[in-house]
């Protein structure tokens, strides 16, 4: 692979001054916007036009955490190495295989006028903020251009691209297999399951006859802000906004609510290409013909310790299936995924303005959501489940969970499936719908879609413990309220341990009396034997079970087992008594070493800490933290707290899981309660940096001030954006 480097003496440029036309335009936009901060620091942005609201919300987001906005765009544009150096090089190359600034600029140029106006206003809001705040020093992006919004247009594209291994890219394009192997891979137990919980309850199962919606994304902490944006053009949406995007990603408006959960549908495929070289050129076999391999040059700037930058140049390859990402067994592997930023941005925005199910489904016809299921509820009493709208039609005789033969035309994608050909639900007789990143075939209990009716590629993950838990808390209830839906979302039962621990206890009981482990493990086994599988701050069994589970998880993930088994099946059926008992001994030893006893309350171990505004926190046992009762979602907890030990710590500190959580009631007037991890501001000096932490850890959701009369009496500040 071609790979060259040359030094560029590029100093970090200071923020540019606003030109007179810019400043005049910003003043007009700012005058049309009012930002109201409530007593939690949450921005309620009102504009005359939709574009004015976008200007104001971009400005408000920048006030709260500009660093996260810039970092998200450095990532989405493939420019992170300009700020973070060599460690981000292969991540940038991965992004640039799919995201081409020239194409995004062309997409912007052909955008409908209404969308151009939104992108223009978004860039204006961020640039006006930088001009008004010279004390803020961007790491790289000193001026935002409207087309950049298309690089971060939907929740799907980033997650899909991230399936490509940077280790494989380094081995292939860097011609550096040894360096690729040296990339740090954390233990599998550190990887918190990505995704979310969504639940919709029909009016017939609620106390007051109103549909209810649970919005419970599991993301890295502080990944999204919470705000409201409204206009005189019909916009009035509230919810979670990923830093730097200009649409409510998960939330609600006056009439409808939508919750996205990461899907198990197969929408990213790999094609094994047979490569031939003829006349100094590269070709790949397709049917009986040879097609030329497409090549293009990508240049990436990489920051050095002296603040200069090195330019790295790559020649990258693609077939009609997509970019080539690795060599496997002599075949080049090309990746196919959704890459339609213009329709994606339109769908992401327009669904926030939909006022009923028909309007929402019309927007879904953009088919530009690939990685998310949707749980929906509205004020007409409808509840619904949607599978991703971007689902390629394929020949189901091929196993697309593995690379398929790219030379066989029968493996090609055959367009996109109509929405009604994917699993979906509307007002099932059960009266409830959920998704926990599991398959759709249990979403409404006995009224769920039937697996036999759909191709295999509609799901690759099967059931999970959270799905079993959701079914448990929903079944048989007919009196749901906002409060009881919150209780369900924070129900402490851990179904994974309810399956795994009886097997461990049986292993122990089967030991002969002469086995040394019989005495050594008697106390820990007694503690676990009497447990009700419920987490809690004072629960000692939770600590022991989680330590045991994490150790066994890492061991089980390395076992060479038959395909088709989940990690839970491997732990229960393949790990064996010795591995399970040894993991318990190791867990007890670790607790004794770190905490002085194997009987330690879970709240002493599991902590929430936010002491600075860094995107990657450095945790410290000596600094303030608060106990968290809920566990990782891998054990079936609906409320998720992805935590583990960090360098220099004994305690577990969380970085992902419950982030923004909301429950919404669709009555005559929409009513909601919500919570955000930590607080709204990324500034440690702000009183809203960590003011929600205790409520977050206890599930004590606060009232949402959606209506003007609800906001009245809770206003800290009302202002127009300050522009130079």
Question: What is the predicted function of each stretch?
Answer:
Residues 84-119, 123-135, 304, 327-328, ...:
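N-terminal leader/propeptide and maturation segments of large enzyme subunits in energy/redox metabolism
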Residues 234-245, 251-256, 260-404:
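Glycine- and hydrophobic-rich flexible loops that cap the catalytic core of alpha/beta enzyme folds
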Residues 115-214, 219-220, 367, 379-383, ...:
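Acidic, low-complexity N-terminal propeptides/linkers enriched in Ser/Thr/Asp/Gly that mediate export
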Residues 344-372, 379-380, 450-505:
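Proteins synthesized as precursors that undergo proteolytic processing into mature forms
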Residues 239, 268, 369-477, 552:
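Hydrophobic alpha-helical segments
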Residues 20-225, 232-234, 239-247, 252, ...:
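Substrate-recognition/specificity elements adjacent to catalytic centers across diverse enzyme folds
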Residues 16-18:
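Boundary at the C-terminal end of the N-terminal hydrophobic targeting segment
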Residues 2-11:
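Bacterial N-terminal signal peptides
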